[in-house]
């Protein structure tokens, strides 16, 4: 049993459900390529929409998977059309009711929610960057609490007073985020690089969890990622399409998270279930070579 998954399901957050749904999406997507059943692409569309309703970042999988259906070698045009059609039907019947509900209630097209602008503002904030430079755990905790309760609360009140609808508020947040970038371009560049690196950090944040827990987490993450990528590399020649698909899948979520706040618990649902599979392959090949 993977300790990280066991820990996550004891916490009330979206990641465990999101992990299940994106993993199910990949399963049904890949099964759809191998079978003639229309159920698999349909269920892939349903799963990716449910994942998007859990965490909107999964919306990027909809065009990605549709394109992958189109460029998969060896699929005839008729089957490709059927796969894409069933996939998009699954997306539509799952996502449309919520979007329609939002339009009826707010008079605006809101696919999932209006948090994009707010999250972009957080990911461009000078104060958020300064938090990442604090080394002491107690000082980090105090500064984080002050940011959430004082600075953010003040700006939230200003945004709510200046806009009267969900998407209008999101646009105000986005505009403030762009102003952050304009006012501090070098800082934003450094922060973006830091977020890009931290996304792949193989230990918990010592600022938040302390050095001991960070070290213990590294003893779990490092072997998984080393063995997982070794197992994945084994597919580079035996199944190059799967190899490229998984690599692009990982990179897609990586790039999508960089403009926003980055913590490794956002990476885990995307990468770790897949790498566990490839870790199993790497271990199996290792023991076969010992015989």
Predicted regions and their residues:
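Hydrophobic alpha-helical membrane-interfacial segments at the cytosolic entry of transmembrane helices
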Residues: 42-48, 62-65, 77-103, 278
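Membrane-interface anchor segments at the N-terminal boundary of transmembrane helices
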Residues: 162, 172-173, 179-246, 256
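Multi-pass, polyprenyl lipid-linked donor-dependent membrane glycosyltransferases
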Residues: 1-29, 38-41, 51-63, 266-271
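Transmembrane helix irregularities
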Residues: 1, 12-14, 20, 33, ...
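Membrane-interface transmembrane helices that cradle and orient dolichyl/undecaprenyl
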Residues: 25-43, 70-73, 290-291
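Membrane-proximal stem/loop segments at transmembrane-domain junctions that anchor or position
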Residues: 111-194
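Hydrophobic transmembrane alpha-helices of multi-pass, membrane-embedded glycosylation machinery
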Residues: 61-72, 271-277
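Transmembrane-helix signature of polytopic, lipid-linked glycan biosynthesis machinery
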Residues: 3-10, 51-52, 96-100, 205, ...
């Amino acid at each position: 049993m993977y300790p990280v998954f066991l820990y996550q399901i004891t916490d009330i957050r979206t990641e465990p459900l999101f992990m299940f749904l994106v993993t199910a999406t990949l399963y049904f997507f890949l099964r759809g390529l191998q079978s003639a059943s229309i159920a698999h692409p349909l269920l892939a569309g349903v799963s990716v929409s449910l994942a998007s309703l859990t965490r909107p970042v999964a919306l990027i999988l909809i065009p990605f998977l549709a394109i992958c259906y189109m460029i998969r070698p060896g699929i005839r045009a008729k089957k490709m059309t059927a796969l894409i059609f069933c996939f998009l039907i699954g997306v539509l019947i799952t996502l449309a009711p919520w979007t329609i509900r939002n339009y009826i209630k707010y008079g605006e097209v809101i696919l999932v929610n209006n948090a994009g602008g707010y999250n972009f503002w957080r990911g461009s904030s000078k104060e958020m960057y300064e938090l990442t430079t604090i080394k002491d755990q107690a000082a980090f905790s105090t500064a984080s609490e002050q940011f959430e309760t004082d600075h953010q609360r003040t700006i939230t009140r200003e945004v709510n007073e200046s806009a009267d609808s969900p998407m209008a508020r999101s646009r105000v947040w986005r505009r403030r985020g762009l102003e952050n970038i304009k006012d501090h371009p070098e800082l934003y560049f450094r922060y973006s690089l830091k977020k890009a690196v931290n996304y792949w950090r193989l230990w918990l944040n010592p600022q938040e969890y302390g050095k001991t827990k960070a070290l213990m987490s590294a003893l779990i993450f490092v072997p998984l990622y080393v063995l997982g990528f070794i197992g994945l590399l084994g597919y580079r020649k035996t199944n190059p399409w799967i190899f490229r698909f998984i690599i692009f899948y990982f990179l897609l979520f990586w790039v999508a998270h960089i403009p926003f706040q980055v913590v490794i618990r956002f990476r885990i649902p995307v990468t770790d279930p897949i790498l566990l599979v490839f870790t199993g392959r790497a271990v199996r090949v290792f023991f076969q070579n010992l015989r």
